[in-house]
Each structure stands twice: as C-alpha cells, then as structure tokens.
C-alpha cells in the first residue's frame, strides 16, 4: 500500500472563516475523509488567554462532522488539529490541511513525504512538564511513526506537537487535591510543557535514554535535547 499526501493552504479572514475550505470540499478538490491534520495560524495573541485557537478547531470540527457522519467530538479525536495564535507582521491567518490516501501503486524508489498522527491521553495538571508527559509523548511519537509507515528513526524529520499548558483553574484543582504542579505561573507552564514534549520526541527517536531523565532536569539541563525539528 502506497501513501499519497496532499497539502492545501487555505486563507481565512478569521478563526471561524472556513468558506474557502467548504468550497474546496464542494468542488471535490478536498475530501473530508482523507484529512488527517490541520495546522493553522489565527489572529490571537498566542498567550494563555488566546481562545481563537479553540474557536478555529471547533469551526473545523463542525464543518467536517456532517461530511464524515460523526459528531464534532469524534472529529476532534480523528483529525490532529494544531492551531497557533499570533499573525503579527507579514504573516496572514491561514490553515494548512494535510490529506492522506492509500493506493496499490508501487512504492517510490526514493524517499517521499509520509504523514502519521497520534494522540496522547489527557494529562493531569501535575503531570504537565514532567516525566509523565515525556513518556506519553514518546509513546505517541512511536505510534505516529507506525501510522506513517516509518520504521527507521533516521527517516523522521519533523514532529509537530500541540502541547497543553496550565491554567489558573487547573492549578487550583491540582492544589485542592494536594498535588503540586510544576509551576504556578501559567506562562512558565508553556515552556515546561514544550520541554517535556521535546524530550519525549528525543526518547522516541532513541536520542536520549528515558532512564537518564528526571522531573528536575526538564527545562533546566540543556545537555538533554532533541535534534528533530
């Protein structure tokens, strides 16, 4: 079985503007059942209180649900949505849609683009930025490699992760249970979550032995790093 990957760049005037995407679907140029991932840039501030990312994701789920015959919640579990807030300067709001289809065509004799996706479970607030997140991310990267049909670590050149962050409500919930989050600063949690995610990639690709890592080193020991973007 051979993968065929399609990439569509779709401009938008706002987080919920999917008119161009709807037109592509209606014309037959974009098949909803082949969509595996959507990456987007919205006009939000990119900070903790940027809700344009969730708004855009909800809009996509609502658009695709009737075409796929499933609920909007099911779409969220089927398609990898990665939204990034902030379009300052010359960057325009847009979505990049990745599609994947399989055929019986013979495989290429040279390396080609392959795409795989995977999801972690939801993390408890006190797990974010710690080894639990590293381990779960590593498992997800391994699953994504399998989904993409990639068997060699050296063939992985890009891993896109949408990692969670702490909010005031999550911090309060953890504290009420007697658990201690990695930080009480929501902005600092963004860095801790990214660090744990990056180390998870490194573990999955065999660049770091998970046994050498510990909670205290995440985001602090700069000798531990991953080389894949």
What do the predicted segments below correspond to?
Residues 1-229:
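Terminal domain-initiation and capping elements
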